[in-house]
């Protein structure tokens, strides 16, 4: 329950409790809080026990922690990531991005050059660069109202 509270936060909570409740009422407040936490835990355990009794003997080993989606999926997959490690290792983001930037800038990357030479002339490369039309001296460039 308090695994994610650091030492500085704990000291801050103690100082804040002393300031709010005062040193006289603080022991009584601590007792009240611990009593309330115990009652909540007892209520939770009795509810879990009632659910186990209602489910019957075939669910005797049922764990409520398995209802957490992460735990449920991890248990169902048997800690096997269904080949996700191979997919992650096979996907090289830097290489893919280099190929995309080379294609955008009109250069041919090493991998696409080797694949096109292996394929021969069967699949020609597509030039994705925009060709600029040369305008005559007195001609105005085309105007695009949506571009402004």
UniProtKB/Swiss-Prot annotation:
Family: Belongs to the TatB family.
Renumbered residue ranges of the record's region Disordered: 100-148
Gene3D superfamilies for the chain: 1.20.5.3310
Annotated Gene Ontology cellular component terms: TAT protein transport complex
Transmembrane segments: 2-22
Name of this chain's protein: Sec-independent protein translocase protein TatB
Keywords of the record: Cell membrane, Membrane, Protein transport, Translocation, Transmembrane, Transmembrane helix, Transport
Subcellular location: Cell membrane
Gene: tatB
Complexes and interactors: The Tat system comprises two distinct complexes: a TatABC complex, containing multiple copies of TatA, TatB and TatC subunits, and a separate TatA complex, containing only TatA subunits. Substrates initially bind to the TatABC complex, which probably triggers association of the separate TatA complex to form the active translocon.
